[in-house]
From Swiss-Prot:
This is Undecaprenyl-diphosphatase. GO terms for molecular function: undecaprenyl-diphosphatase activity. Pfam families: BacA. The lineage of its organism: Bacteria, Pseudomonadati, Pseudomonadota, Gammaproteobacteria, Enterobacterales. HAMAP family: Undec_diphosphatase. GO terms for biological process: cell wall organization; peptidoglycan biosynthetic process; regulation of cell shape; response to antibiotic. It is a multi-pass membrane protein. InterPro entries: UppP (IPR003824). Its EC number is 3.6.1.27. It is an enzyme of class 3 (hydrolase).
Length: 273
């Protein structure tokens, strides 16, 4: 593979990663299709995907740095309040409660989850995740109980974390699972999306660090330019995607995203079967 060819592939995959990582459409589904069509598969490709995810994570940190640093600075040493008594400020406890279910299941079943990473499972996950988005739009309360991030309760944060466990199924979409869960729990579409982004930082950093540690041996110095291009591209595109997405969901529902997931599932079937 020539240098220019590899850099072009890196840029294309960086765009795909940046566009899809935080939208409820499954970055995994898109990456396996595009990677297959480009002929970029195998251990190096998996390591590359792990590295460029860091670019997407950095975009969230840049977008929400005030909120993230504010969370770190909040004192939360007092005991947990009862349901309904903790409204008024999003705290680090909300993030921790949102992390616990997926972290526990992810550590317990890491190898099993990795074994699910194949086109057929991704295709089914795309469909089921799309159905969940439709269900969330149809079944959500008419008036959200938590219109803003600072209105969320600990219970809502924990239940969103439980929904996040669905994203351990490759192709389901972490953002799709958490946003749908938030809406079903009475969090507004916009606030659920913001919480999903904030929750992504520790979750994705932890998962990416673990994957990078396990796949570090496949990275060579010759890969650095390609990985750098993918990282930077994913970062820039993710910044644009997040800003656009947060504006878009003020005006439209998630039904179009669900339909798009069904189309991607069909594309997976056509490409691989």
């Amino acid at each position: 593979m020539s240098d220019m060819h590899s850099l072009l592939i890196a840029a294309i995959l960086g765009v795909v990663e940046g566009l899809t990582e935080f939208l409820p459409v499954s970055s995994t589904g898109h990456m396996i299709i595009v990677g297959h069509l480009l002929g970029f598969e195998g251990d190096t490709a998996k390591t590359f995907e792990v590295v460029i995810q860091l670019g997407s994570i950095l975009a969230v940190v840049v977008m929400f740095w005030r909120r993230l640093f504010g969370l770190i600075g909040i004192h939360f040493g007092r005991p947990l309040q009862h349901e309904g008594e903790n409204k008024g400020r999003l705290t680090l406890i909300h993030i921790l409660l949102g992390m616990i279910p997926a972290v526990v299941l992810g550590l317990l079943f890491h190898d099993t989850i990795k074994s699910l990473f194949n086109p057929i499972n991704v295709m089914y996950a795309l469909v089921v995740g799309g159905l969940l988005l439709i269900a969330a739009e149809c079944l959500k309360p008419k008036e959200p109980r938590a219109p803003g991030l600072d209105d969320m309760t600990y219970r809502q944060a924990f239940m969103i974390g439980c929904f996040q466990c669905l994203a351990l199924w490759p192709g389901f979409s972490r953002s799709g699972a958490t946003i749908s869960g938030g809406m079903l729990m009475g969090v507004s579409r916009y606030a659920a999306s913001e919480f999903s982004f904030l929750l992504a930082v520790p979750m994705m950093m932890g998962a990416t660090a673990l994957d990078l540690y396990k796949s570090w041996g496949f990275l060579t110095t010759g890969d650095i330019p390609m990985f750098a291009v993918g990282f930077i591209t994913a970062f820039v595109v993710a910044l644009i995607a997040i800003k656009t997405f947060l504006q878009l969901i003020k005006r439209i529902s998630f039904i179009p995203f669900a339909i798009y997931r069904f189309i991607v599932a069909a594309a997976v079937y056509v490409v691989f079967f």
